[in-house]
Amino acid sequence: MMLYRIVMRRYLASTWTGYGAETYGGRWNHKGHAAIYLASSVSLAMLETLVHIQDSSTLSEFELFQIEIEDSNIMLLQPQDWPTNWRSDPAPATTMDIGTEWLESESSLGLLVPSTLVPTENNLLLNPRHKSFQTCLSSVQPLSFAFDPRLK
C-alpha cells in the first residue's frame, strides 16, 4: 500500500521518528507513545494537514513523502471496533486507547484507521518501534509538492 505524509520543513529531521505524536498525542495515540500518521492518498494528506494549519502563510513550507507498506504488515481496524464517538473533537480517550494498545502490542507495522475528515478513506498509524520499521524506510521517496496558493 502506498501512503503519504506531509511535513513542515523545519520538522524534516523527525519525519520518521513519531516525535510529534509522542509529544502531543493524536486521535489514535496517547502522549508518550510514538506513532507516525500517514494518509492513503495525497489529497487526504493535504486535508489532514490543512485542518491543523492556523497560518496560511506557512503553506509553502511543506514537503511530501511517499512510503510503501506491504499489506501483510497492516492491520485494519474494523468498523465494528470503532468507538461510537470516534469522530469527536477533541479526540476522545477511546480512540487513543485503541491506538495506544495496538502500538504497545507491536502486533503489526501499521494500523489502518478511518479518517475523521473523510470517513470513507483511511489513515494509517505506523509504529516506529515495530521490528519491520527500519526495513520499510528504504521505500521512502520525496515527491514534488506544493499547496495551491488558493487554499487558505
Swiss-Prot record:
InterPro entries in the cross-refs: RES_dom
Keywords: NAD, Nucleotidyltransferase, Toxin-antitoxin system, Transferase
Xref: Pfam families: RES (PF08808)
Enzyme Commission identifier(s): 2.4.2.-
Taxonomic superkingdom: Bacteria
MF term (GO), any: nucleotidyltransferase activity
Top EC class for this record: transferase
SMART domains: RES (SM00953)
Family according to the record: Belongs to the MbcT/ParT/Res family.
Assembly, per entry: Homodimer. Forms a complex with cognate antitoxin Xre.
Protein function: Toxic component of a type II toxin-antitoxin (TA) system. Expression in E.coli inhibits cell growth; bacteriostasis is neutralized by expression of cognate antitoxin Xre. Probably depletes intracellular NAD(+).
Protein name: Toxin Res
Native source organism of the sequence: Yersinia enterocolitica serotype O:8 / biotype 1B (strain NCTC 13174 / 8081)
